[in-house]
Design a protein with these regions (language model features):
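N-terminal Rossmann NAD(P)H-binding glycine-rich loop of SDR-like oxidoreductase domains
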Residues: 16, 24
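Residue(s) in the substrate-gating loop at a strand-loop-helix junction
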Residues: 132
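Substrate-binding pocket helix/loop in short-chain dehydrogenase/reductase
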Residues: 90-91, 98-100
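C-terminal helical subdomain
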Residues: 172-173, 188-224
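Conserved NAD(P)H cofactor-binding loop of Rossmann-fold oxidoreductase domains
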Residues: 82-88
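Active-site helix of classical SDR
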Residues: 114, 148
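Active-site loop immediately N-terminal to the catalytic Tyr-X3-Lys motif
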Residues: 92, 139-143
Length: 224
């Protein structure tokens, strides 16, 4: 079902990140009123965002408060989660702290966001999670990262069925490697040499176009 974004209230979690900022900008350009949930509001683009709430996504209580805060200003029509962390290395190099961090940010946090926002999102709205291509095409040397993203993808797929009666689209976006610089900020390991990825602006534009068009899934092929 196609949707109009003009005047709609969309919450972008991670709007200070490279990709999150571009998504917020494209949403604003499409006429949406964009709220941000971030850890550091000083890095926000004031031209794209009209309000913000502070939260670390691995703090479920803070996430709940943040969603309630932005919803108190205007009903929520959609949510986009653009947060994530990455790690590299073989399975023998994986330590407990890295494993816990990957699943906390990439799997548990999106599920908590969906739990806290599901009752706040208006019927006919949407929730977008960026899991990435590794969710369905796991990569050697990135086993835990791939698994954490696959867990989020599975949850999004299940909840999409739960919210179908309310016509809420739960969209899992699985773009290929994107030049966000995330690989240089890995929580562990060193990134292997990668081919040049997509630009963040191209990925952000495609995601916003999918929201407007009412697409329900964005596999890697959708970014070709």
């Amino acid at each position: 079902m196609a949707r109009e974004l003009v005047g709609k209230h969309v919450v972008v979690v991670g709007a200070t990140g490279v990709l999150g900022a571009r998504i917020a900008a494209h949403l604003a350009a499409a006429g949406a009123r964009v709220s941000a949930i971030v850890r550091d509001h000083t890095r926000l683009d004031g031209a794209s965002v009209f309000q913000y709430a502070l939260a670390d996504v691995i703090d479920s209580a803070a996430v709940q408060i943040a969603f309630a805060s932005v919803a108190s200003v205007a009903p929520i029509d959609g949510v986009v989660n653009a947060t994530g962390v990455v790690a590299f290395g073989g399975i023998s190099d994986l330590d407990d702290a890295t494993l816990a961090r990957l699943f906390a940010v990439n799997a548990t946090a999106p599920i908590v966001m969906l739990r806290e926002s599901a009752t706040l999102i208006a019927d006919g709205g949407f929730f977008v999670n960026l899991s990435g291509v590794v969710a369905t095409q796991p990569v050697a040397g990135m086993a835990a990262y791939s698994a954490s993203k696959a867990a989020a993808w599975a949850a999004m797929s299940a909840v999409a069925r739960e919210l179908r009666r309310r016509q809420i689209d739960v969209i899992d976006a699985r773009p290929p490697h994107t030049e966000t610089g995330l690989a240089t900020r890995a929580v562990a390991g060193v990134a292997p040499k990668m081919p040049v990825g997509l630009t963040p602006d191209v990925v952000a534009a495609r995601i916003v176009a999918a929201i407007i068009a009412g697409e329900r899934d964005l596999p890697v092929e959708a970014f070709a």
